[in-house]
From Swiss-Prot:
PANTHER family: HETEROGENEOUS NUCLEAR RIBONUCLEOPROTEIN (PTHR13968), HETEROGENEOUS NUCLEAR RIBONUCLEOPROTEINS C1_C2 (PTHR13968:SF3). GO terms for molecular function: mRNA binding; N6-methyladenosine-containing RNA reader activity. Residues 16-87 form the RRM domain. Belongs to the RRM HNRPC family. RALY subfamily. Binds pre-mRNA and nucleates the assembly of 40S hnRNP particles. Interacts with poly-U tracts in the 3'-UTR or 5'-UTR of mRNA and modulates the stability and the level of translation of bound mRNA molecules. Single HNRNPC tetramers bind 230-240 nucleotides. Trimers of HNRNPC tetramers bind 700 nucleotides. May play a role in the early steps of spliceosome assembly and pre-mRNA splicing. It comes from the Eukaryota. Pfam families: RRM_1. GO terms for biological process: mRNA splicing, via spliceosome. There is a cross-link at residue 258 (Glycyl lysine isopeptide (Lys-Gly) (interchain with G-Cter in SUMO)). This is Heterogeneous nuclear ribonucleoproteins C1/C2. There is a cross-link at residue 240 (Glycyl lysine isopeptide (Lys-Gly) (interchain with G-Cter in SUMO1)). Tetramer composed of 3 copies of isoform C1 and 1 copy of isoform C2. Assembly of 3 tetramers with bound pre-mRNA gives rise to a 19S complex that interacts with HNRNPA2B1 tetramers. Component of the 40S hnRNP particle. Identified in the spliceosome C complex. Interacts with IGF2BP1. Interacts with DHX9; this interaction is direct, enhanced probably by their concomitant binding to RNA and mediates the attachment to actin filaments. Interacts with PPIA/CYPA. It comes from Mus musculus (Mouse).
Length: 313
């Protein structure tokens, strides 16, 4: 963007021009300034100088919006001081009569513009602008170095004044009385301290006793738990042995029942065999009786036949 646009002194250009003071130009460049202020409107000119810059907008509304939005903003560790070029802040100038920017610009001798189209306008040099703003606005320079640390002055020793013997005697008496008073005070303080120490010791003793009691309780509980844990395996073993014994007895009972059932079955089988034998014997006897009965009528018939034979003869 053209930088000579910011040199125009016509009222319209002055009212739409923004002055950016307290700018850290060592870090902030022209492109940064344009990027920051382009969001408020179209920029037709921008110039960056040592410690300050100018931004030329198309109209005054955009310039005022930029002043309202960016004044007091911190950039590169410095708080910006922004206002319209035609309306400098009153409380910023140095002591003395403050003149408006138009008056300051008007006091400068006019010179023709380099371009024929801008022959009616008047441009100013950057040097003049820098001098003008340096005169009108005071900006803090770099932070001055801290003052050197003053060396500690060692006070000179006082010379002892030698007095007469009477003064020495009085001073000795006073020192003795002071020592006595201090000793009595120290004795009282020692007594108070001793009482306080005794109280603290008694409190500590009580705490220690309570701690010992709690430790004894804990030890007793632990011993009980240990006894329970020791006795529990024995009980488990006893229970297991009882269960084994009961299972063995149950098994024995089952075997006895089986044996008895088997013996009963054998007895019943033997009884059945005996019964079968008896039946067979009875059946044999019956058959023999039947045979005897059959023989008897045959014998009768033989007797009859023999008798009939005898009769015939």
């Amino acid at each position: 963007m053209a930088s000579n646009v910011t040199n125009k002194t016509d009222p319209r250009s002055m009212n739409s021009r923004v002055f950016i003071g307290n700018l850290n130009t060592l870090v902030v460049k022209k492109s940064d300034v344009e990027a920051i202020f382009s969001k408020y409107g179209k920029i037709v000119g921008c110039s960056v100088h040592k410690g300050f810059a100018f931004v030329q907008y198309v109209n005054e509304r955009n310039a005022r919006a930029a002043v309202a939005g960016e004044d007091g903003r911190m950039i590169a560790g410095q708080v910006l001081d922004i206002n319209l070029a035609a309306e400098p802040k009153v409380n910023r100038g140095k002591a003395g009569v403050k003149r408006s920017a138009a008056e300051m610009y008007g006091s400068v001798p006019e010179h023709p513009s380099p371009s024929p189209l801008l022959s009616s306008s008047f441009d100013l040099d950057y040097d003049f602008q820098r001098d003008y703003y340096d005169r009108m606005y005071s900006y803090p320079a770099r932070v001055p170095p801290p003052p050197p640390i003053a060396r500690a002055v060692v006070p000179s020793k006082r010379q002892r004044v030698s007095g007469n013997t009477s003064r020495r005697g009085k001073s000795g008496f006073n020192s003795k009385s002071g020592q006595r008073g201090s000793s009595s005070k120290s004795g009282k303080l020692k007594g108070d301290d001793l009482q306080a120490i005794k109280k603290e010791l008694t409190q500590i003793k009580q705490k220690v006793d309570s701690l010992l009691e709690s430790l004894e309780k804990i030890e007793k509980e632990q011993s009980k738990q240990a006894d329970l844990s020791f006795s529990s395996p024995v009980e488990m073993k006893n229970e297991k042995s009882e269960e084994e014994q009961s299972s063995a007895s149950v098994k024995k009972d089952e075997t006895n029942v089986k044996m008895e059932s088997e013996a009963g079955a054998d007895d019943s089988a033997e009884e059945g065999d005996l019964l079968d034998d008896d039946d067979n014997e009875d059946r044999g006897d019956d058959q023999l009786e039947l045979k005897d009965d059959e023989k008897e009528p045959e014998e009768g018939e033989d007797d009859r036949d023999s008798a009939n034979g005898e009769d015939d003869s």
